[in-house]
């Protein structure tokens, strides 16, 4: 009768002691694996998504602006521009309201006799231009006036920037002059091509062209038909349609 009593508590003690050792290492082991799997895929997905959309729209906007600026450039033969040089001088000086505001402030009004001479020369050359090319020719004259004013403004800015450098560095003047000549050549080529018109210059081109189209045909008694253009003008600038 003494043997079965001590065996039962020993077996139950061994069974209870083995259960926690088998259950404890199984529960915490999958938890760190789940944390690593949740954190690791989240980091690469959020970083590239924030950097992609910032760089994409800016080159597209620059290309659209350059395309619209190129569409506003009149294409005329150089011989026609040389032929209408008296008209350019007449419009550029104070004989007409097309003259630039800076030029009006800097100098006085020309004499009526000189304006009359330029008017006669312009009216002699304008009827010789073919009728279909007169509108683009007048537009090209205004365009060349805007570029000439832009070159003068840039030249004055460059001369102001070069004055303090020449006072501080008098030894390397030949090298500076050669570098300045090399740097001015591509700028003049860019202005000649006309691919860097600013929005305010495009609006100025439209306004000055409309004024010139009111002055020259009436002054010279010449018909200048306006042809509807298919290109879109940016920034709300419109072109007139009709005939003088």
UniProtKB/Swiss-Prot annotation:
Compositional bias segments (type: Polar residues): 35-48
Keywords, alphabetical: Repeat, Seed storage protein, Storage protein
Coiled coil: none
Domain of life: Eukaryota
Region (Disordered): 18-64
GO molecular function, one term: nutrient reservoir activity
InterPro entries referenced in this protein's UniProt entry, alphabetically: Bifun_inhib/LTP/seed_sf, Bifunc_inhib/LTP/seed_store, Glia_glutenin
PANTHER family: GLUTENIN, LOW MOLECULAR WEIGHT SUBUNIT, PROLAMIN PPROL 14P
Function noted in UniProt: Gliadin is the major seed storage protein in wheat.
Family as reported in the entry's similarity comment: Belongs to the gliadin/glutenin family.
Other comments on record: The gamma-gliadins can be divided into 3 homology classes. Sequence divergence between the classes is due to single-base substitutions and to duplications or deletions within or near direct repeats.
Protein name: Gamma-gliadin
Species assigned in the record: Triticum aestivum
